[in-house]
Amino acid sequence: MLSVPAFGQTKVTIEKAEIVNNTTVDGERVRKLYDAVLSSGDFRFMSDSAWQFLDKDEVHAFGNIQIDTPTERIWADTLIYYNILELSKLRGRVIIEQDSTLLFGNSVDYNFATKVGHFLDEIRLEDTDGILVADSGIYYQNSDSAEFRGNVQLADSAQYVEGDSLFINRETKFLRLFDNLIVIDSTNNALLTGHYLEADSTGRRYLSDDAYLRSIVTDSTTTEADTTHIFGDEIELTKQDTTSFIDAMGNVRVWSSKFSSLSDTLKYNSTTELFRLYGDPKAWHNNIQLSGPFISVQLKDNNVENLTSYPSPFAVQEDTVTGRLNQIKGDTLSAYFTDGDISKIDIYPNSELLYHTKNDANEPDGAVESSSPKTILYFDKGELVRAWMGQNQGLFLPEYTELSERKLAGFIWTPELRPIKPTREPLPQLPPISADRPFELPLRFVNRTNVERQ
C-alpha cells in the first residue's frame, strides 16, 4: 500500500490500483489511478478510476463508485471529494444506505463530518415503513430527520400524503407538512386537506389554513357507511386508547347525511358519539334549525338521538307542506329523535310556542301561540300530534294574510347558512409513487445486494 500526503495533514492510502500514472493537468500534479481502492481514516472508497490532485485536498473519481464508512455506504457514478471539508459532491446514480434506510438521488452534496446530505435533484427515501419522494431534500443522519421540498409524496401501509414541503423527524415520528396537502388515512378511513399539518407518534394531527376532514364510519348494525365532512380554520385530532377526539376552531362547518352545523368551536368524542358546539352555533336536522349559545348533538350508531341547547335557544321547524315556520324558544331545549325523525321536544323553563295549524286539506288554518313554564311537544313521523303545556297562557290565531310572517321575539331562521354536501371530492394531484427505483442500480450495489441474499 502507498500512503500519499496529498490532503494537508491527512493521508490518502492507495490500497489497490491496477495502473498508476503521474501527470499534469492544467498545471496541477495529478496521480491517475485505475480500478482503485483508496482510504483516508475510516473513509474507504472504490471506483473504476480516480484522480488525486496532489497540490490540493481533492480526489475526483469516476465510474462504479462505492464508499464505505462506519455509519453509511454510498454508491455513485462520479465523485469530487474535498478532504479538509470532508465534503463529497456525488453525481449520477447516487444511493446512500444508512441502517435500514436507502436514499436515492441524481445530485447529492454529502458532508461526512456533519452527516448532512443535500439532494439537489430529486430524492427518494425508502425504509421499512414506506417510501417518500420529492424534487429535492436535505437529510440529517445524526438527528434522523429530513426536509423535503417540491411535489412531496409519502406512502406507507397506513396512509398516503402529498404536499409542497415536509419536515420529518423519523426518530420521534414528528412531521410538519406545508401547502396544498392531502392525507388519505386508510387506517382510520379519513381524508384531510389544508395548507399546514403537524403530526406525531401519539396520533395527534393538527391541521390549519383551510382545514378539512372527511371521516367515514360504518354503522355496525346496518353495515351502511356515513360520511361526515368538517371544515374549519383549525382542526385537531387526538387519540386516547380507543377513543378519538376532534377539536375544530374558527368558522366550523359540518355536513353529514344525519345533521349539519355551523359554529365557532366544535368538540367530538368518538366513544360517547357527542358533538359539542360553541360560539353562536346553529344545527340543522331535516327541516329543523336549532340556534343557541351552546348546542350538543348526541348520536347513537351514527344517527341523531338528541339535540340540546341552552341558554335561550330558538328552534324553527319548517312545515314541509305549507312552508310555514313553527317556532319554539325558552331557557333549555332538548329534541329527541327516533329512526331519524323528531319524536319529542322538551323546552323549559319560560317556554314560548308558535305553531301553525292545517285543515284536513293540509292548507294553512291559523296558529297557536302560547307561553308556559314547560312545554312538551310530541311528533309522529315529523308531524306534531300532541302538545303538553304547564300553566299555559295562550291563544288561537285565526288564519289571516300576514300570519305566515308572525315571529316570536328573538326569531332566528337562516337556511342560507346551512352547510351543503361538498360536490367535489379531494383527490391526489400527483401520479402514484412508482414501485420502481428512479434509475438502473449501480453494479457494485447490485453485487452487494446479491451477496447479502445468499
Label every PLM stretch briefly.
Residues 7-454:
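N-terminal amphipathic/hydrophobic interface segments
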